[in-house]
Structures are given as C-alpha cells and as structure tokens.
Amino acid sequence: MAPNLRKSHPLLKMINNSLIDLPTPSNISAWWNFGSLLGICLTTQILTGLLLAMHYTADTTLAFSSVAHTCRNVQYGWLIRNLHANGASFFFICIYLHIGRGFYYGSYLYKETWNTGIILLLTLMATAFVGYVLPWGQMSFWGATVITNLFSAIPYIGQTLVEWAWGGFSVDNPTLTRFFALHFLLPFMIAGLTLIHLTFLHESGSNNPLGIVANSDKIPFHPYYSTKDTLGFALMLLPLTTLALFSPNLLGDPENFTPANPLVTPPHIKPEWYFLFAYAILRSIPNKLGGVLALAASVLILFLIPLLHKSKQRTMTFRPLSQLLFWTLVANLTILTWIGSQPVEHPFIIIGQLASLTYFTILLILFPLIGTLENKMLNH
C-alpha cells in the first residue's frame, strides 16, 4: 500500500492529527463551535489589521487623520476598518460564549487547557485596549488615560510604573507609538498561545455535553466537524458583515469622532461594551486600590474555578440547581454590563455594588455550596 503523505509528511502529519483524523466525541453540540470561530476571528483581525497598519501613522498629529484617510481614500478602506472594529466585538462575543460553555460543561477540569485559555483572554483584553487607543479620538485618549492611571494605585511603585508606561508625564506621542507596537505584536502572541492551548486540549481530547469519557464512541474530525464548523463560520461572518455594512458605528462611541484633546474631558468616559462588566465592578468600590483589585479579581477569579468544583458530576447537564445558578450569573453579568454604561449616580451606584457583590458571591460561595448539596441529594 502506498504511504499516505498526509500521515507521513512531518508538517502535514501535525495538521492531520489536529484537524483531519482527530478523534472527536460524536455528541458535541454547537457550543463546541466557538473554538474554531475564535480562530476565524483571529485570522480576520490579523488580515484586516495588517491592511490597516499599512495606511496608519502612529503619531499624535497624524493618527486621527490617517484613519480618516484610510476610510475616505483607500480602496475599500472603510470596509476594512469597519470589519476590524466590529470584528473585535465578535471576537469577544465568541470568547465569552466559549468560556460560558467551558463553565457550564465542566471543561475547566482540563486545568492546563483552562489556564492557557485565561491567559489568552487576558492577552486579548490587552490587545483590544491598546487597539482602541490608536484612532486617537476623545474616547481613545481619555480611555487610555483613565485605565493606565489605575496602575498608580499600586503602592510605592505605582506612579513610577505609570510614567514608565506613558513614556512621559501624560498620555502623549510616546504612549501612542508604543501602543501601536504592542497592538501589532500581541495578536501574533495570541496565535502562539492558541497553539499551546490546542496542544493541551489534544492531550486529553474534547469534553462533551454528558461529561463522560467518550473514547469508545469517537468519530474523525473531518468530514463531520469540519462541515459543522464551516456552517458556524457562515453563521458568524453573516452578522459581522451585516453589522459592518449596515450600522458600523452601532457599538462605537460618538465621542471618538472628535480628535483627542487633553484639555476637554468627555462627560462620560466608558470603554467598549465588552469591558463594561469589569468597569462596573471597578467603579462599584469607592477606593482606588480597592477598585483596581476588584477589577483584576473579576477576571482572575477564573483561575480558581477548577478548585471550586465540588460536584461528583462534571457537567451541569443533570444538575438543575447549578443550572439555575449559572443563568443567574449570566443575568448578573448582563446587569453589570448595563451598569457600566450608566453615569455614576443613584440608583446605578447601589445596583452596581449589589451586582458586583453577587458576582463574587455566586462564583466563590454559592457554586461550591450547591455542588455539595447536589451530591447529598444524589444519596437520597
């Protein structure tokens, strides 16, 4: 029998083992599509970003104009920019759904895969933040000022750290140039981390909705899941292009159509929608250092999730009480997102504080408690 190049060639063999002949559980649902969708998001963002970088000038006097020039004078520049800006939103939608899936189905018990995933999330958040500064509009400038300023809350070294990050005594040209350098670099770091993430995943194989070992009933990834993924691509790229073509500025802030002006502060400084939940938690504590710690904890708490798993069952498929708690957490995050977009006044302050408290309570206290309770219920 002639040797199969796909299985013998050193490079093709790797692709084959991870995308073609990969043994996959036969019962994974559409919730397992988001990993590949994130891959498509990353590819799209790198391609559109590369094309934008060719026309962008990282200088405070030219940045805003260079973005306007791209949209007005470059062939399909407006489309490239709209796809890139809204592609970021879809990236976050996919990653949040992907994390939610992992949480619901107990995928976090693959600890290495989960932890590399959290590092990927943090890198993505950093990339989105530095990218938002590049158009050098009002919200770009003031967002950069407010968020980088948070580091000054770190005792003793805080102020020095912030001035070192800024490259001066305020957000200015050095800040913009280094943010552009970082925004160019980080997506490639994300691509590298993704390979590590997949390496760890393929050590154990995919989890499945029942949370049981599926080795006895696995099917090849291609053609089954390659086809299913292609449908997922179409279902994501369709709303992305629709948004980019019909209402590209729907998720943006009108303030960013005004060039950055250090002398005029916008009435409401707020980040893009995908950071609002964390922003609400930051603002809910009336102390700078406390707020910064809560902000960090809101994402870093994900590292603790595997340690807080007390149930005898892996997934929530057959755990109605945990399901109820899970959807309460989703509702809670929705409330936090809404609060983050509101001004700091009554009743939003108290709602934000209660929602922040509830967020940490559900994750740190209620989930382990309910898991233990469900174990006891299994015995009766």
From Swiss-Prot:
Gene3D superfamilies, per the entry: Cytochrome Bc1 Complex, Chain C
GO molecular function: metal ion binding; ubiquinol-cytochrome-c reductase activity
SUPFAM superfamilies the UniProt entry points to: a domain/subunit of cytochrome bc1 complex (Ubiquinol-cytochrome c reductase) (SSF81648), Transmembrane di-heme cytochromes (SSF81342)
UniProt cofactor(s): heme b
Localization, UniProt: Mitochondrion inner membrane
Membrane-crossing segments per the record: 34-54, 78-99, 114-134, 179-199, 227-247, 289-309, 321-341, 348-368
Top-level division of the source organism's lineage: Eukaryota
Residues given in the record as heme b b566 binding sites: 98, 197
Single GO BP term: mitochondrial electron transport, ubiquinol to cytochrome c
Record: residues binding a ubiquinone: 202
Membrane topology: Multi-pass membrane protein
Binding site for heme b b562: 84, 183
InterPro entries on file: Cyt_b/b6_C, Cyt_b/b6_C_sf, Cyt_b/b6_N, Cytb/b6-like_sf, Cytochrome_b, Cytochrome_b_C_euk/bac, Cytochrome_b_N_euk/bac, Di-haem_cyt_TM
Cofactor binding remark: Binds 2 heme b groups non-covalently.
GO cellular component, one term: mitochondrial inner membrane
Main location: mitochondrion
Keywords: Electron transport, Heme, Iron, Membrane, Metal-binding, Mitochondrion, Mitochondrion inner membrane, Respiratory chain, Transmembrane, Transmembrane helix, Transport, Ubiquinone
One protein family per Pfam: Cytochrom_B_C
Function: Component of the ubiquinol-cytochrome c reductase complex (complex III or cytochrome b-c1 complex) that is part of the mitochondrial respiratory chain. The b-c1 complex mediates electron transfer from ubiquinol to cytochrome c. Contributes to the generation of a proton gradient across the mitochondrial membrane that is then used for ATP synthesis.
Assembly mode: The cytochrome bc1 complex contains 11 subunits: 3 respiratory subunits (MT-CYB, CYC1 and UQCRFS1), 2 core proteins (UQCRC1 and UQCRC2) and 6 low-molecular weight proteins (UQCRH/QCR6, UQCRB/QCR7, UQCRQ/QCR8, UQCR10/QCR9, UQCR11/QCR10 and a cleavage product of UQCRFS1). This cytochrome bc1 complex then forms a dimer.
Protein family: Belongs to the cytochrome b family.
Additional information: Heme 1 (or BL or b562) is low-potential and absorbs at about 562 nm, and heme 2 (or BH or b566) is high-potential and absorbs at about 566 nm.
Name of the protein described by the UniProt record: Cytochrome b
Gene source species: Aptenodytes patagonicus
Phylogenetic placement of the source organism: Eukaryota, Metazoa, Chordata, Craniata, Vertebrata
